[in-house]
UniProtKB/Swiss-Prot annotation:
Forms part of the ribosomal stalk, playing a central role in the interaction of the ribosome with GTP-bound translation factors. One of its GO terms (molecular function) is large ribosomal subunit rRNA binding. GO terms for biological process: translation. SUPFAM superfamilies: Ribosomal protein L10-like. Belongs to the universal ribosomal protein uL10 family. Keywords: Ribonucleoprotein, Ribosomal protein, RNA-binding, rRNA-binding. NCBIfam families: PRK00099.1-1 (NF000955). Part of the ribosomal stalk of the 50S ribosomal subunit. The N-terminus interacts with L11 and the large rRNA to form the base of the stalk. The C-terminus forms an elongated spine to which L12 dimers bind in a sequential fashion forming a multimeric L10(L12)X complex. Pfam families: Ribosomal_L10. It comes from Polynucleobacter necessarius subsp. necessarius (strain STIR1). GO terms for cellular component: ribonucleoprotein complex; ribosome. This is Large ribosomal subunit protein uL10.
C-alpha cells in the first residue's frame, strides 16, 4: 500500500529528529532475513538505545538532507535497514553482532562524526568497548594502587597483632654508624 504525502512527511520528520540527536548511522542490507529474526534484531537494538528502521531510501535521503549524514546518500541503494544512535558505537555493535549469527544481514556503510565508513570501518567501530566498559576499566586501573596499599597495610597490621618480627623496611630507618 503506497504512503500518502502526510505519512511520508511524518516519516521524514521522525527520522530527521532521530538524525538530529545521532552520532552514528549504519546501513545494512536485510534481504532474505525471516521476520522473527528481524524482530529479535529490533528488540536488541531497542535495548541498546538504537533507532532501527526499514525505510524507503528516498525518504531517508530527504531526512538526511542538510545534516552531517548527507554523505550517506550515495550508499542508500537497495533494501536497507537503518541503525541510528546517539551512542557512537551502539548501532555498529548491534548490527555487527547480529550479522555474526545471520549471514544474510550485510553491513554496507556507515557514518560516524561526519566521516563515511566502509564495511571495515563499521566493523572496527563495533569492536571498540562501550563507554560504560571503558569507564569500568579506568576505574579498575585507578583503584588498583589503592587496593594494593590497603592489602599491604592490612598485612602489616596483622603481623604486628600476631607479634611477628617487623619487616626489613624498619632497618632502613636506622642511621648508619659513623666510621
Amino acid at each position: 500500500m503506497p504512503l500518502n504525502v502526510q505519512d511520508k512527511k511524518a516519516i521524514v520528520a521522525d527520522v530527521g529528529a532521530q538524525l538530529a540527536g545521532a552520532q552514528t548511522v549504519v546501513l545494512a542490507e536485510y534481504r532474505g532475513i525471516p521476520v522473527e529474526q528481524l524482530t529479535k534484531l529490533r528488540a536488541s537494538a531497542r535495548d541498546q538505545g538504537v533507532y532501527l528502521r526499514v525505510l524507503k531510501n528516498t525518504l531517508a535521503r530527504r531526512a538526511a538532507q542538510g545534516t552531517q549524514f548527507e554523505p550517506l546518500a550515495d550508499s542508500m541503494v537497495g533494501p536497507l535497514i537503518y541503525g541510528i544512535s546517539a551512542d557512537p558505537i551502539a548501532s555498529a555493535k548491534v548490527l555487527q553482532n547480529f550479522a555474526k549469527t545471520q549471514d544474510k544481514l550485510v553491513i554496507t556503510a556507515g557514518l560516524y562524526n561526519g566521516k563515511l565508513l566502509d564495511v571495515a570501518g563499521v566493523k572496527a567501530l563495533a569492536t571498540i568497548p562501550s563507554r560504560d566498559e571503558l569507564l569500568s576499566q579506568l576505574l579498575g586501573v585507578m583503584l588498583a594502587p589503592v587496593s594494593a596499599m590497603a592489602r599491604v597495610l592490612g598485612a602489616v597490621a596483622a603481623q604486628k597483632a600476631a607479634g611477628a618480627p617487623a619487616e626489613a623496611g624498619t632497618e632502613a630507618n636506622e642511621t648508619p654508624a659513623a666510621e
